[in-house]
Amino acid sequence: MEGVLYKWTNYISGWQPRWFVLEGGTLSYYDSQEDAWKGCKGSIKISVCEIQVHPSDFTRVDLIIPGEQYFYLRAINAAERQKWLVALGTAKACLTDNRTKREKELQENSEALKTKMSELRLYCDLLLQQVNKIQESPLAETSAGSGEGGDETGNLVKSTCTTFLKTLEECMHIASRTFNPDLLSRTPPGSPSVATIKPQKIKSNDPKNLHPGETRKDLINTSGTSAHESGPDNEPPPSPQENISTAHTESGLMEDQNDLIEPNNGSSSSTQDHEEPVEEQQTDGSTEDADHSQEEQQEVSMSPTQNKQEVQEDIQTDLELNETQSENKQEEEDEDKVDTFFSTMSHRFSDIILEEDSGIPTQAFLDSCYAIVPVLDKLGPTVFAPVKIDFVGNIKKIQQKVVSDPESFPTLQSIVLHEVKTEVAQVRNSATEALLWLKRGLKFLKEFLSEINTGVKDVQGALYNAYGKTLRQYHGWVVRGVFALALRAAPSYEGFMAALVSYEGDELKEGFRTGMHRDLDIYLPAMENQLSILDTLYEEYGLESDEIV
């Protein structure tokens, strides 16, 4: 659809006729139909904007992207406005339906993947329980004493466990990078810990024929063999994170082996420290082997069901303790830090890194200017609309200058110096003039926020003082009247504070005031420094103007 609509330009020029074209979900406007070949003067995406119908003016419709773009439009009559509303609503509905469909598909895929992750964790629990049961059963001891058959069985079980645990750990790391890490940070109820797996119970040789020291060495070699079989020869090179996770898993298994083997080596090590006859050493060794066999029989005689219940009870207790500690830690963090509007801004003056000779990066500065516009909305979206329109209009004038030759205007100073050189700096609607009014508007906001930061709770008084220090001297009686009306409609201190939080009710928390002072103490000095640099530049080239509008 296309046609003529009246667009609000500023509080001096008022409503001006423009040629509008709605195509492909984008509304673009031109000076006139004849000048359309020159390119559009501006555009707005219908899918992301709010379409607001004026409550009293039956010819007006507003298109708003909060904090970014504002199109205030009027049709020739109510019937014409209705046509545009139908066209705009249809375009928005079509685009929204497609976007909703994509979001729904993404959500369904996410839920399906989460379900698969839960199943994977269940399979992990079952495998760990089965391995634990096999290791605790008499069959494991019998097969361990059967020579090569026991050696094969032991290596196979250990290799399978190591490979499965490593693969499972890799899957969990991938999932944690894809979704919220908290999803995988806790062990589900009933999941046996890795420490319950006791690889040393499956012996590769008869311990009666080996010295205790050789038994320990053989176990370590067996562990190394199984790790080698499931290692890099059969799998792609792991990432650094996978190396770390594998190292932790292997070190945990080795610690369990050492803890259970060292008591058996204690007597042998003390025996080896002294020179004694060979017969005595053999006698001591046979005695130790007999004791060790009795201990193993006692362990085997334990009920697998009883062992499983004890493991589950221990894990459940640890899980509850970890959850309690996590909740307490989260509560402490929530009390210490409260997000404010200034800590969650997409772009901030305090994040701008100046270039050589205090050069202010153009795009970063303009993005920070766009990001502070919502403060005017929080003061009053209706009464401050003319101020906001003028503020955003100046930003766009500078943006158009940058778009014309981005490489030539990396800093604000380069724009001003270029226009000074070409003698267009003081021409009406030049980028230099737009920057002049933009920095005046920023000074107004800085003075107002500075008063609020010092503890002033009279929002209307703070606005009046800031206006008197910055903009009032450049305004005639008409514009002063507009500002006076806006100041009288300013919100209360509590209402303004409530608009500066990310979550409703945060303004009542103890950490909110501290967070607000913390954020403004960082934000305002950086803003003041950059405005001071611009003031110095304008004074140096005599670009300041006392003209009253």
Curated annotation (Swiss-Prot):
Residues 1-93 form the PH domain. It comes from Danio rerio. GO terms for molecular function: ceramide 1-phosphate binding; ceramide 1-phosphate transfer activity. Signal peptide: none annotated. It is found in: Cytoplasm; Golgi apparatus, trans-Golgi network membrane; Membrane. It comes from the Eukaryota. Cargo transport protein that is required for apical transport from the trans-Golgi network (TGN) to the plasma membrane. Residues 203-219 have a biased composition (Basic and acidic residues). Residues 299-309 have a biased composition (Polar residues). GO terms for cellular component: cytosol; Golgi apparatus; membrane. CDD domains: PH_FAPP1_FAPP2. Residues 180-245, 257-312 are annotated as: Disordered. InterPro entries: GLTP_sf, Glycolipid_transfer_prot_dom, PH-like_dom_sf, PH_domain. Residues 276-288 have a biased composition (Acidic residues). Keywords: Cytoplasm, Golgi apparatus, Membrane, Protein transport, Transport. Transmembrane segments: none annotated. One of its GO terms (biological process) is intermembrane lipid transfer. This is Pleckstrin homology domain-containing family A member 8. It holds the Pfam family GLTP. It is a peripheral membrane protein. SMART domains: PH (SM00233).
